[in-house]
């Protein structure tokens, strides 16, 4: 696996950090000069297609997402409370994980703060957020690097990214850089599957998944994936969005996952397509990864499928018990840091 190293000397300006990343900038186009795309050893891109079929399933139109889910959600009171987080002091060898909500996580080590798929917005265009983030965005610590798994609106929220950008690096899949290059990040790194980058002491690698990356209708060129983060000898895996696919076993063999952040919601999709794992498939993926701890995500925040908001977690607990992994399941509360 390729690994590029970024040195991150820091200059503190108030609570904002400036990062002097020692990385060449190979593009001359001024508006996107901060986008760096890593290539394979022979200079070619190594993208492999693991895109789901985008054609809706038969009879999908017989259900009405607008009438059954979207409009009723507008009248649901947004749940949750903003609570100032109590971030602990992280000792060497420890890692602190804070679930913010949906697929957003703050990963902290004693040297680095990593923010993944951050979204604080109350709306995804017309889809209402039904659960508040665990804390307000100004309670975030200084962020050293941001990771975005793909360009879908519930994972790449430009409004949130603009607020957290403070001249630090951001890492995205191939083809996503032009969506974030103008938001205030010092450098944008585009990765292909199995490519990696070293940010300070943490190794970050892009892993395959079974999904798609278009933000609109015609931009199917955009990449998508998950991130494996090697932190002090332990690997945390953020799956991104995915349906179940055979690649989980390969990811587990390649990265030796300790903590798996796996999506469990939005499986009853409006189009009928299988684009997200259900809770039972998440348990199966966890077993294929041969991971040690399962932390569920991508549920309870936005109602992106027909299933009730409470159903994914209830089904996950039942499935975990049925497969004998209940002790490996760790359900987080939004905004509550957990040290592992």
List PLM regions with ranges:
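Cap/insert and terminal regions of metallo-dependent hydrolase folds
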Residues: 37, 43-51, 145, 169-171, ...
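Active-site metal-binding loops of divalent metal-dependent hydrolases
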Residues: 118-121, 150-151, 209-210, 240-242, ...
């Amino acid at each position: 696996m390729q690994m590029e190293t970024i040195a991150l000397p820091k200059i503190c300006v108030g609570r904002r950090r400036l990062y002097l990343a020692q990385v060449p900038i190979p593009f001359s186009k001024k508006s996107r000069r901060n986008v760096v795309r890593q290539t394979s050893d022979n200079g070619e891109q190594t993208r492999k297609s693991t895109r789901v079929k985008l054609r809706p399933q038969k009879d999908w139109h017989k259900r009405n997402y607008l009438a059954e889910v979207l409009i009723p959600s507008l009248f649901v009171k947004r749940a949750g409370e903003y609570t100032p987080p109590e971030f602990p002091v992280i000792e060497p060898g420890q890692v602190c994980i804070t679930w913010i909500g949906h697929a957003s996580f703050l990963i902290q080590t004693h040297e680095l703060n990593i923010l993944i798929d951050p979204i604080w917005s109350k709306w995804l265009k017309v889809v209402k957020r039904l659960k508040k983030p665990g804390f307000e965005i100004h309670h975030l610590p200084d962020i050293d690097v941001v990771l975005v798994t793909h360009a879908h609106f519930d994972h790449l929220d430009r409004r949130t990214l603009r607020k957290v950008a403070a001249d630090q690096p951001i890492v995205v899949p191939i083809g996503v850089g032009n969506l974030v290059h103008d938001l205030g990040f010092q450098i944008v790194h585009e990765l292909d599957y199995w490519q990696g980058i070293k940010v300070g002491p943490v190794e970050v690698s892009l892993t395959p998944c079974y999904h798609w990356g278009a933000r609109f209708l015609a931009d199917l060129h955009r990449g998508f994936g998950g991130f494996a983060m090697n932190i002090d000898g332990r690997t945390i895996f953020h799956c991104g969005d995915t349906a179940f696919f055979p690649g989980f076993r390969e990811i587990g063999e390649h990265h030796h996952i300790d903590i798996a952040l796996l999506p469990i919601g939005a499986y009853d999709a409006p189009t009928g397509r299988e684009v997200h794992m259900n809770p039972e498939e998440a348990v199966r993926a966890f077993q294929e990864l041969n991971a040690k701890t399962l932390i569920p995500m991508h549920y309870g925040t936005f109602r992106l499928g027909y299933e009730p908001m409470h159903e994914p977690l209830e089904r996950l607990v039942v499935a975990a018990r049925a497969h004998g992994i209940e002790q490996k399941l760790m359900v987080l509360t939004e905004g509550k840091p957990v040290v592992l």
